[in-house]
Amino acid sequence: ESLKNDKGNSLLIAGSNNPNVQMLVNKINYQLGNYGQTIDTDNVIELYKGDDVEIEEFKNELLSGDLDGVIFYGSNPVYSHPEGKQMRDAISSLDLSVSFSEYMDETASSCQFVCPDHNFLEAWCDHNPVSNHFSIQQPLIRPLYNTRQAQETLLVWTGSATRTNSESEAFYNFIQKYWLDNGIGDQAEYFDFSEFWNWTIHNGFSNSQNELTQEALVFNDVALGSSNNDASSDWEFVVYQKELGVGHHAANPWLQELPDAISKIVWDNYITMSPSDCYKVFGIDDSNQKSAWDGIHLGQEEKAFVAKLTVNDIEVKLPVYPLPGQKSGTVGVSMGYGRGENNEDIGKAAYQCDEFGNHLDNGDGGLVPIGANAFRLCSFKDGHLSYNGFGNISATNERYSLAGTQTHHTVMGRTSIVKETTFDFWKDNFEQNQEAYNPKIKLHSKEKGAHVEKDATEYSLWEEHPVENVGHRWGMSIDLTSCNGCGVCITACHSENNVPVVGKDEVRRARDMHWLRMDRYFSSIEDDNRKNWAKAKHEGDFNYADLEIPEENPSVVFMPMLCQHCNHAPCETVCPVGAT
């Protein structure tokens, strides 16, 4: 009803690759009047243009022996395809197999030839992420190793270019000629192509003025097909993507140590489920909410429970993180983990370590991957890759240590930590609200033998340093309404300031060294019942212990805590939602 009453101001998103689900969501958005309001059809997103049907056809031809050779660029199907293990054996038996992977990943390890590509920081390239927007990727450094850009290699192999040396500009010249021949960008605005090209390189992009011809949107009442999900099992699972991505960056310690936006867990993969489901699966008495919440453990002070998720014949065993707000009967597993399970050389950060920082041995001389490969749970249905389905969950007797950067999970007093109100209320009551929403901190001291109380801003550890005449000074405010806790600012700060990565065990000891912290708070089951923050002044039936228990479907608040001493802060410029 709330969507109907506020037409044109909402947005429904399909969490499935199933065309029937997407058409249904599109029809609902149409009925709600969202097209032309919250949905812009004039700007076409050109990202993720893969074709699931072609991938499935390739897999079938590969497994049936109908292929003689294959070249892999920017893909790793042995890891990311549900039937990757079968594909690995088939690739090894081909007459020709080539990979352009930067390192010996799961697919490259099965190929006859590996021609390592430049890192993207070492290479020229061009991109068209959105219609009429074309950008240029420039190398920041010369290649560190003896690598060759994949595009240039293909040009040489096809006889379209000649490689001169390691600093060959064959692909750069190809890009330049392609832009000239095809009229890419706003070339008509410049005197000649040379001037246009120099400005494009300088600015990094060029926008085309060509008007796109969009076909008219037609929504009819044709019956949609089934979603084809087999609901014979009790649990619905979802394979989702978080900060680590789809697996390309599993060896990046910055991202491994970046706390998940919601769970705040680092260096691990896990199964998420609602707290109420945790009580049932692990046999925890929930008659007392506080003892039940304490009993499911968050894996920091005590080891987390471990569960086994079974989908068809695939089993995944992972620690469990109880996630407030998750729908009962569902579980979530993140993709991007479980790299290098066949002893491939993914990178040191992709494998588990003991408390002393030494890699764990799998018993066969190899290393133990972090987490499990969730792509094995996916399946192809009617030509599309499905990231959700149904399976079974069972408890195990095992326990596992998780590392989190935050163990206090609720606001514990919304009025004292998070100041929330509407702009109109704030504006209409500005004089009164200045003190109410941002109270001044008082400090107590003695002056001339008498007790005095002053604002904290009147005290300083340092000698007086006037700043009135120093000109512009850096300062930053953060719109908490826009902030979604993604953590991009944390990694930018980590990189800019060469902050050490300490590893999982040190994070468990609360020794993480991030200069910027992203706190996440859930609303508490008792928060609305408290009349006053001061316990002595509180009136009515109220339990302070229950403030530690999140609501079943809580509100979520993100609050960054910054270092407050950076004059050219990268956290300001990288925010993807413009909250800074």
PLM feature segments, named:
Residues 23-57:
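Anionic-ligand anchoring segments at beta-strand to alpha-helix junctions in alpha/beta enzyme folds, i.e.
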Residues 43-47, 56-144, 160-163, 177-518, ...:
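A cross-kingdom feature strongest in bacterial/archaeal respiratory oxidoreductases
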